[in-house]
Amino acid sequence: IELEGLEGDAFEAAQYVQGAGRFTAATITAHHLLYNRNAIFTGGIRPHYYCLPVLKREEHRLALVQAATSGSDRYFLGTDSAPHPAHLKEHASGCAGCYTAHAAMELYAEAFDAAGALDRLEGFASVHGAALYGLPRNSGTLSLVRESWTPPDSFAFGEAELKPLRAGEALAWRVQG
């Protein structure tokens, strides 16, 4: 289940997942942990924050953060990164989806850090999903360092350009190496 995609109250959705059978779990995106629906409209319409399901009210964002950072094995990373060319995002019928692949782990680290739960990020990102599906854990590792950096304004995307989430805005974490 994509937790933020369940209709209605995110707190009730999280309770449903937690109380369901052991093979029921939910993924949660970094952008739904970091932003509420106001992000789409701050300073004018920001099409690169438009996604489906649409970002929720603040109380629902907080419920998603609580679920993700709880340490429960019922919740795990689901980037749902959506690389749409900028010209298809920036018009009247713009495509839904946030491009987060360029900084997925850094965005999740910001969310978990803000919640005081960095110690639970590894389980959410690397352990819970594999365990649910009966898969071995990855043998490789990555390291996150608290180091400010700014994603580029865009990436080449075939003949078009791709504007990532947080383009031109500082991120607090960086994958080392």
Residue ranges and their predicted role:
Residues I1-L77:
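Histidine/acidic residue-rich metal-binding segments in metalloenzymes
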Residues S139-G177:
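C-terminal cap of metal-dependent C-N hydrolases
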Residues S70-R137:
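His/Asp/Glu-enriched, well-ordered alpha-helical/loop segment
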Residues E7, D80-S81, R146:
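A general secondary-structure junction signal
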Residues R37, L88-E90, L144:
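Residue-level detector of alpha-helical segments with a strong bias toward transmembrane helices
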Residues H31, A82-H84, W149:
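Short, glycine-/Ser/Thr-/acidic-enriched flexible segments
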Residues A13, G134-T141:
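Short amphipathic alpha-helical segments with coiled-coil-like heptad repeat character
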